[in-house]
């Protein structure tokens, strides 16, 4: 019987990546970020280990959606009390908390387990172009989510 080699935990050193969300499609951006957080881009990916990297997303306020999703996509939350349902459109949530839009999209693409919650903590999202993680020397990760666009 063949067994898949499991990398030792001390060899799993995470890297830091910087992703610019300006003029990127929300869903396609979230797919790439989720893959980086899980570590699926690495040759030593192991599903039950945290092999992922840290991802810094800047310019969250400039992420776009296509079609009528700007006014028709709804975000719901509930306070737990009777009648406590709050509903916001994409445009309202992006104006109020632009980071939350990307966080919710990426969180839905990660495993809904303890490991997924741990990987989600490696996501850092900022509304503007500045972030406090210069000391980690993040590498710019080029991302192109517009199909057919010339790069």
Swiss-Prot record:
The keyword Ribosomal protein applies. GO terms for molecular function: mRNA binding; structural constituent of ribosome. It comes from the Bacteria. InterPro entries: Ribosomal_uL13, Ribosomal_uL13_bac-type, Ribosomal_uL13_CS, Ribosomal_uL13_sf. Keywords: Ribonucleoprotein, Ribosomal protein. Pfam families: Ribosomal_L13. One of its GO terms (cellular component) is cytosolic large ribosomal subunit. One of its GO terms (biological process) is translation. The keyword Oxidoreductase does not apply. PANTHER family: LARGE RIBOSOMAL SUBUNIT PROTEIN UL13M (PTHR11545:SF2), RIBOSOMAL PROTEIN L13 (PTHR11545). Part of the 50S ribosomal subunit. NCBIfam families: rplM_bact. This protein is one of the early assembly proteins of the 50S ribosomal subunit, although it is not seen to bind rRNA by itself. It is important during the early stages of 50S assembly. Belongs to the universal ribosomal protein uL13 family. HAMAP family: Ribosomal_uL13 (MF_01366). This is Large ribosomal subunit protein uL13. It comes from Synechococcus sp. (strain JA-3-3Ab).
